[in-house]
Amino acid sequence: MTSTNALRLRAAIALPVLVGSLFAYSAAFAQSTGTQAAEVQELVVKGQRGPKVVGQVIAESAAKSRSSINQEFIATQIPGQTVLDAINLLPGVNFTNNDAYGSAGGDITLRGFDSQRIALLQDGIPLNDTGNYAIYSNQQLDSELIDRVTVNLGTTDVDSPTAAAAGGTINYVSAKPKQDMGAAITLQGGTENFRRVFARVDTGAVGPFGTTAYLSAAKATNDLFMGPGGIDKMQVNGRVYQELSNGDFMSLMFNYNENRNNFIRRATLAQFNTNTIPVYDSTCVRPSASGVAGGTAQIDISCSNFYRNNINPSNTGNIRGQSSFTLSDKLRATIDPSFQYVLANGGGRTVFKESDAQFRTPTDLNGDGDTLDSVMIYWPNTTNTHRVGVTSSLIYKLSDTSNVRLAYTYDHGIHRQTGEAVPFNAAGDPTNVFGGKDSFGNPIRLSDGTILRRRDRTSIADLNQFAVEYRARYFSDKLLVNAGVRAPYFQRNMTNYCYQRDTFTAYCTTQTPTSVDAAGLVTFAVSAQNTSAANKYGTPRSFTRKYNKVLPNLGLSYEVAENQTLYASYAESISAPRTDDLYDQKLVNPAPETTTAFDIGYRYQTGKVVGAVAIFSNSFENRIVRTFDEENGIFNSRNVGKVELKGVDGQVGWEPLDGLSLYASASYITTELQSNLPNGLNGAIIATKGKELVEIPKLQASIRAEYKIGDFSFGLQGKQVGDRYSNDLNTEKAPAYTLWDANVRYVLPQIGAAKSSLQLNVKNMLDEKYLGDISSGSGSAAGSFQPGYPRAVVLTLRSEF
């Protein structure tokens, strides 16, 4: 049977259940085309008719811990919401959304690992920042275009195109164009002046080859729920899909996203407890330039809390190709090329005297004809990335029950970090949100001809990865063996064009420095950005860092009885040091972080109940943290030892009655640091041995109930998050909280060809007061917190034609 016919068969006899979500595109909850093709072949061999879906739980067959959701469940959430919020009910996942609508950012943890140690992929291509591996939740694909999402808990797939996935992977897959011509539009309105429109047009099958395509666009705006400012987001997407014979296909997709956001001001735990959370200022009055040479000195105030200075603009986009070709009756090739573009910063401002020593000679910053003033300027940290990659596989069918796959991944990212300064205009906005970057704005040029900038450095990251995987069934198909190994070879070529005090503080100047030691460190005269003549800086330099490791993974599953399966998995992963770990005053070379993950799990799958439970243990080696160097008065990156993460998690879906489905998940995670942190000279330490990781809730639980009757559907869901520590010594913690959400949908009577529905969503229905994302404190220092969003109500009208 061809994979195309298999898909048709599954679609024809798919279980009529379901409630949170019926998935009929493919049963391969995988990332790349190669992984998908290998797993589709496995399912055809096994004779499965499509995954069972009960109460949101999708029945998994992989020999590892994995959870998935699909579009039918995603559609019950607020349309346009970030995809990471949609997976928040899954076991082991904790996503803290900065607002109710998904465009203000957020943070995610997975089985005890933070977002910089989790790989996020879109159609198999890596989306993490190429420098610090951060995940930007507000830049993800419009939710209407996501077919399914798969979470590998603590492991990767054998061809995962990443050198930074110690904690697991999250991959979401784009929807295919429809076979019939049509259009869809979504109109939304809600609290905080939320407005959104989404439109999609499908060509249907056109031309002599039956090519299908779609184009979509979305626009969303809302006010911040706390303080002045707002969110403005625009996104455009498209896909062309060409089905060939024998299950072969070619596809080309693109995504472009723009965000223009103001930040919500963070708070301390004390401010939260006393209900005194501050907000950013709505006004800032600064003196105007006199326009007279030799006039009076104007002194700008810093306006550090002015909301228009605290912005987070981003332009991001990618082009993604996918293809699968049958080379013979036993051999298949897949090729997935990609290109990505990122331009973003987090705002910033500073005040310079026009006679500042950093300039060498006085410079007229505000154009008033003199150099007597103190002028506030826009001072961003801008990141610009150009990234190309390809993931490819050759899959050879050894027999009807086994195959072997060879995979190769290449990922090349040019990661440019700059900070070209520009003035503010009369309204208090920067003349360009991206500063003087390239052709966006006019940078401030100093008297010596150089550009005034906050930092200036380049990282060129190259990943070459080879992998092999063997997949087979034995003993009347009861035993599944999945064995593989991947070998990533990762290299960073790094150049810093400025002087560096620590990883966060660069000093870009043409001043003549004073050498102070044999290590090549230098000092400068006091200036606005160099507050002490004793501060030491490393000189501009270029250097290379290389990392490689052979990473095995093994998975076994055995059908011990009808509808019951036991599985076990072992996997090793790596997370190479981030750019922030490498740019420093002195050359540093921390070893890559590594993990060893063990899972033992049980699955029960029938027509009415689908469930899974797993016990896991993860050893996290060579953890990189920034510890204090007392001699130089700065923090350096270094390896500080091991962390043990252990726990149990599970989920169950149950359909007790027609139209009623129930879902529940729970996670219990313990984390323990095995070492103390060095803290300066003479053996001083921060006593972290035996302490828990920050930001990680020990206990989480989720529930959801959904009921469908006639043209109505009703949903209620809750997520409980336990206490989370907010400093290294565990002396401060954010309190536990529970959020309840609800959704109601009514299918309107059809008028002509139009099919419409109204949907009401309520987020944080009980208006819980809580703290979201945590920026943890070092030692016993207090952390800072993102205030949780209040109750939000959204009404959505969907129409398809």
Each language-model region and where it sits:
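C-terminal beta-signal and adjacent terminal beta-strands/loops
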Residues: 2-4, 719-726, 746-801
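N-terminal periplasmic "start-of-domain" segments of outer-membrane beta-barrel proteins
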Residues: 42-78, 107, 149-151
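Extracytoplasmic beta-strand/coil segments of soluble accessory domains associated
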Residues: 46, 82-126, 147, 154
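A beta-strand signature from Gram-negative outer-membrane beta-barrel systems
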Residues: 140-186
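Short strand-turn segments of transmembrane beta-barrel domains in outer membranes
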Residues: 168-205, 215-227, 717
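Acidic/polar loop-and-plug regions of large Gram-negative outer-membrane beta-barrel proteins
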Residues: 224, 241-243, 249-324, 341, ...
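Structural signature of Gram-negative outer-membrane beta-barrels, strongest in the C-terminal barrel
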Residues: 385-387, 395-413, 426, 436, ...
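Gram-negative outer-membrane beta-barrel transporters
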Residues: 476, 563, 610, 617-619, ...
